[in-house]
Amino acid sequence: MSRLDVTFKTLDGLTLSGWLYPAAQYGPGIIVSPGFNMPREAFVPDIAQWYQNHGITALIFDTRTYGLSDGQPRQETSARKRVEDFHDAVTFLSKHELVDPEKIALWGLCFDGNMCLAATALDPRVHAVVAVAPVIDLHGFPERRRAILELAMQDREAQMAGEEPIYLPYVNEDGTVPLGPSMGSDFWPMMTRLKIPVENRVTVQTFYSAFSWDIMTLIPYVSPTPAMMVTPENDIECPAAEQIAAFEKMGEPKTFHLLPGKGHLDWAFGDVDSVMEKQLEFLKGALNF
């Protein structure tokens, strides 16, 4: 089936770029997003196409400062602004001729699982949410916080004096990251193998923003929107125990799907259909289609 290049505006005037996967008939829509520092090419095109093939019009897009979307500095994430980008994506998708605006869902992986839960808590137009391996705690290892905050304040002063933003690596060659748990030594080989064009840099202000974000304060407000959490049992990058604690704090209606023996990303390789069928079952019940 076809994929269309699309653009849409944000409330503050940026143009965001994405791909639309139109279903064969009028019905539900879903916005699918791949996670922190990832372009739209990462992981989710196959997910979007799967939903398209099962009667759901799917949208994936580059959030601000990433890929082909507007925004400066490049590779900078403000959690609050990223959530607002999801609101504006809902506005765009709700006006499409194939989409029933009363049947729009969000789907987020890792960091964007967090963002989609937040967007759902704040946007009554969202009628279901699927959070896959969502990162819950953005505060990182305590022993690293002060050094990063000191660098962030140096960066603010330098930018005020006309200097370029300071960047940190997204993931080091050995798989370690600035804030916390390692992504594993196979991270970059996997990105190369999958031909995902990831820029290995993130502004230090991104981490400053992350330190002030706490999804647990919003989790209770996801309800009454139906929510599904998909948790890989052996997730180390986004610890399964933290995901379960967030799920337990949610109100009803909610659905939990544990992926036995799976890690943060390896669930996407192998029997993906069985994972997706559970999500489709949830969405059919939540969106009534």
Swiss-Prot record:
The lineage of its organism: Eukaryota, Fungi, Dikarya, Ascomycota, Pezizomycotina. This is Polyketide transferase FMN3. Reducing polyketide synthase; part of the gene cluster that mediates the biosynthesis of fusamarins, isocoumarin derivatives that show moderate cytotoxicity with IC(50) values between 1 and 50 uM. The polyketide synthase FMN1 probably synthesizes two different polyketides, a tetra- and a pentaketide, containinga varying number of double bonds depending on the selective actions of the trans-enoyl reductase FMN2. The polyketide transferase FMN3 is then responsible for the fusion of the two carbon chains to produce the furanone skeleton of fusamarins. It holds the Pfam family Peptidase_S15. Keywords: Transferase. The active site is at C110, D235, H264. Homodimer. Pathway: Secondary metabolite biosynthesis. The keyword Transferase applies. Induction: Expression is induced when NaNO(3) is used as sole nitrogen source. Expression is positively regulated by the cluster-specific transcription factor FMN4. Disruption phenotype: Impairs the production of fusamarins. The gene is FMN3. It comes from Fusarium mangiferae. It comes from the Eukaryota. Its EC number is 2.3.-.-. One of its GO terms (molecular function) is hydrolase activity. Belongs to the polyketide transferase af380 family.
